[in-house]
Amino acid sequence: XWSCTKGCPDAKQCEAT
């Protein structure tokens, strides 16, 4: 998954961790 701190392309697919 994507990491929110890395700046994912879609916040909805971004992991809360």
Swiss-Prot record:
GO CC annotations on file: extracellular region
Chief location: secreted
Keyword Ribosomal protein carried by entry: no
Keywords: Calcium, Hemagglutinin, Immunity, Innate immunity, Lectin, Mannose-binding, Secreted
Molecular-function GO terms, alphabetical: D-mannose binding
GO biological process: innate immune response; positive regulation of erythrocyte aggregation
Record's subcellular location: Secreted
Record note on quaternary structure: Forms an oligomeric complex with the C-type lectin 65 kDa subunit.
Function comment: Calcium-dependent lectin involved in innate immune defense. Binds mannose residues on the surface of the Gram-negative bacterium A.salmonicida. Shows agglutinating activity towards horse erythrocytes.
Protein name: C-type lectin 35 kDa subunit
Species: Petromyzon marinus (Sea lamprey)
